[in-house]
Every structure is written in structure tokens, then in C-alpha cells.
Amino acid sequence: MQGGGGVSCAVAGDAPSSTRGGGGGGMLGLTLFDPPGGEQPAERIGRLVRESPVVIFARRGCCMCHVMRRLLAAVGAHATVIELDEAAEEAAASAAAAAAVPALFVGGAPVGGLDGLMGLHLSGRLVPRLREVGALCG
């Protein structure tokens, strides 16, 4: 990830690419702290959560973030993964009402961290909820 308060996005299961601006590897080229049109970071995060069926706020190198991505990929879910640097993490936590990273949102509603995801999965409610918001492959 490039320094200076940026954020990168990749679809769960894809390896992030070093290219920007929609290049290969699922990279969306999203910059959180330099958005076009004057959109503030909190507004941009809120919009991403509302517009995407499944959003994971993650940190590169976080083992819980990796487990969350792998579980969603294993059940066939399309997820938008937003990797935050330390400066962006504070804004995301504030804007998205997330206490910590990883933070998962399904259908615009907060699920929580890895414990919330595992609770849904073990109770058998994860796949139906993902299907309901249109996040499953196929």
C-alpha cells in the first residue's frame, strides 16, 4: 500500500495489485483521504458500506482479517475488502461505528469482527444473510 493515508480495495480472495486506477488483481484504486469532489473520509466510508453488499475493513498483515476473508471466500461471497493504514483506521472506526479492525458489514449493517462472523457461520445464518443481500457467487 502506498503511504500517506490511503486505502486500497480488493475483492476477497484476490491478491492486491500494486497498480492504481482499476488495474488488475481486483484493485479499485480507492484513496480515502484525497477523494474527488470534496467527499470527506467519513462520508466515503459510509457510502461504501451502504452501496456494497459485504464490506470488510481490514489491516494488512492482520491474521483475523485474513481468516475473515478466507471464510467469506470459502462460502462463495463477493466482499469488498478495504485495507486501512493506521491513520485511515481511526476515521473508519469513527465513521462506520466499528470498534476495531477487522470490521464486517453485511447489507449495510454491522456484523462486528471475526467473532460476529463466526457466530453467524456456526449458527447457519451466514449463507442465508449473504444470499439475501446478493453477495454470493453464482
From Swiss-Prot:
Gene3D superfamilies: Glutaredoxin. Disulfide bonds join C62-C65. SUPFAM superfamilies: Thioredoxin-like. Residues 17-40 are annotated as: Disordered. It is found in: Cytoplasm. Signal peptide: none annotated. InterPro entries: GlrX-like_pln_2, Glutaredoxin, Glutaredoxin_subgr, Thioredoxin-like_sf. Keywords: Cytoplasm, Disulfide bond, Electron transport, Redox-active center, Transport. GO terms for cellular component: cytoplasm. The keyword Electron transport applies. The keyword Hydrolase does not apply. Residues 42-137 form the Glutaredoxin domain. Belongs to the glutaredoxin family. CC-type subfamily. Has a glutathione-disulfide oxidoreductase activity in the presence of NADPH and glutathione reductase. Reduces low molecular weight disulfides and proteins. This is Glutaredoxin-C7.
